[in-house]
């Protein structure tokens, strides 16, 4: 699936998403046109191999793209968001620490569903410099891995 757009921020977010979320059964080429505005209403319209998005930011553009690619019974939709933020919290404590690729894939899926935030409940599953036995013998995220996840989340529009 080849996406094309002139929006630099959307290109960056889409390249991150496409690394982890495969897009099947779609046309070989899809040109995405984005019109940003400040009011709450947002919409998408598909005409042949072109997709027209109207939204207030890249996060909403990803969500509209996700809807446009999965709602095969319609060619257009208008939405008024009821929430400014939508978040999920994952419990990664008690030896249920996801690998980085799994977390990145999950963040991409959340972005395509319109989520703006993701929190990790970690208890002692993170590295604490100077305390080598903190979370001893448990899966945990190093400081570098936490930074990598945070940077990736920002690239797909999670705060």
Regions found by a protein language model. Give the residues of each.
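Feature activates predominantly on carbohydrate-active enzymes
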Residues: 19, 47-159
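Acidic, contiguous N-terminal accessory segments
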Residues: 1-77
